[in-house]
Amino acid sequence: PYGEDVSLGQRIAGPGTELFSAVRAAFPDLKIIVENDGLHPDVALLASACALSDMRVMQTSFDYCGSMPDAYPDRCICYSGTHDQDTLTGWLNRMSRVRKDALKACLNTEEEDVWALCDLCIRTLMDSACTDCIIPMQDWLHLDSHARINAPGTLGENWMWRMHEGQFHDQLERQMAQMSMASGRQSSENM
């Protein structure tokens, strides 16, 4: 209920396959993305049973499951993080040494520089089999927690971040294009 601590809430199962079968029958071309935070295995089962794309969020899947993008299925959309999560730089800066070492092992690197690790995370996501890959601009820019969009359950500074003129520059554009081409997500003809 409004005003209550969100941690006291509970998840209630919805109608499941019956609903999506009815929606698919009425709107056969409708594209639906299932929000899958990785915490409830039945969500992935529902997406699979209904041939729906679901999402994989690197921060969530690594934090809770130890799963990395190379294990993501092809019929999904991958994200480095969502509006409700920290930026990649913020996430990496808060990460314990043990967790960071585990991430580095998964990325097959000894790299310590946080910005370089951000770029490796982005490259790993882009190289995944996922049909689509969404990287928030804050992650491309290596911005820390101050550029976080939303901190659930808080008031005040949420939804305030804006990219400033000049933050997007030629070097970043080239980096994005090169990563997109190398991962097969953009052809050189589109550059």
Each model region followed by its residue ranges:
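Active-site and adjacent substrate-binding regions of carbohydrate-active enzymes
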Residues: 1-191
